[in-house]
Amino acid sequence: MACARPLISVYSEKGESSGKNVTLPAVFKAPIRPDIVNFVHTNLRKNNRQPYAVSELAGHQTSAESWGTGRAVARIPRVRGGGTHRSGQGAFGNMCRGGRMFAPTKTWRRWHRRVNTTQKRYAICSALAASALPALVMSKGHSIEEVPELPLVVEDKVEGYKKTKEAVLLLKKLKAWNDIKKVYASQRMRAGKGKMRNRRRIQRRGPCIIYNEDNGIIKAFRNIPGITLLNVSKLNILKLAPGGHVGRFCIWTESAFRKLDELYGTWRKAASLKSNYNLPMHKMINTDLSRILKSPEIQRALRAPRKKIHRRVLKKNPLKNLRIMLKLNPYAKTMRWNTILRQARNHKLRVDKAAAAAAALEAKSDEKAAVAGKKPVVGKKGKKVAVGVKKQKKPLVGKKAAATKKPAPEKKSTEKKPTTEEKKPAA
């Protein structure tokens, strides 16, 4: 299967190439924007909605009144009366059985959406460009494995078909009947309440036939399941991208295919059938960035890569690491050496001062000993002790103190103490 080519072959009703070629319209090279297609499809689909609303009286067709406070029940309005289960039940609220809904729907909701004309055209261009890529068409689920070429163009004679058997024969010759078989196999019953609303059966989408003039082609193809027919002048994004997804399998007639350049123009020429419309362009012609960056034109303008390796440096504390401190402050070495010298000098001064004080104390003790007339005797450990001075005994502690004999108590004398009169001599 051929991808998008500058020339597209035109196939006859026998499924063979007729020998004619058609230039590929520029719209098939337009940028594919699935986001724009989805946005436009979502908003245009809302224009088919029918307004609906609930009755304004729904949920309020009963007499109910709140009981107020003091009864240990909720203050929701309650049905009045007695003699039935309904009396005393809650009413009106959206949380009550038989009550109204929250925010009852109204018919004056904003049902429709306006979409910019240029944006709608952009979406159609993207959908047409995607229909020419086999990968996107196959990802959409179409069976096009045996189709000879994409986009598929047939002669204008097909527009004059009036019989369905002619249309079926054409699809079989073009190897497109496999897509119709897929539609037949997908026919099933709808799930949900749509069965009760005249939407019982559902099926997949088949090919989209795009023509220029209706000379009976609609009657020939309309009864084949899955087929969609579109006029090239009235392309619809809802049909070209069902569900908002690009990649619809399209079969073109020759005249409709040639008319695309007049409808959407090219990048050199504006559209002749639309006023002031230019075909959207790509931001990049070539999206292969690796090929662009490796091209000689780009490489010639680039500088040589720098091979400098930036290694992570372990941060060290300069207050604890002298080498790092010297990098930050070379004068730190001098400051530290001056500190060491100052400390040594101060230490020497303290030692000298202590020695001088000891010498002065020794001289003073010598003077006292000379005054007493006793020569000082050098004792143990270099201590000077005066001669004739008894050494004080240490107090006894413990068992030794208990073992020593206690001195005998003095006996009381029997002699009477003289009175004051006897002591005093007579005058």
Curated annotation (Swiss-Prot):
GO BP terms: translation
Omega-N-methylarginine modifications at: 97
Chain intervals with Basic and acidic residues compositional bias: 407-427
Positions bearing the Glycyl lysine isopeptide (Lys-Gly) (interchain with G-Cter in SUMO1) cross-link: 364
Subcellular location: Cytoplasm
Sites bearing Phosphothreonine, chain numbering: 266
Keyword Hydrolase: no
Residue ranges with Basic residues bias: 377-397
Site of covalent link Glycyl lysine isopeptide (Lys-Gly) (interchain with G-Cter in SUMO2): 239, 327
PTM text: Citrullinated by PADI4.
Gene: RPL4
Protein name: Large ribosomal subunit protein uL4
Sequence positions bearing Citrulline: 300
Molecular functions per Gene Ontology: structural constituent of ribosome
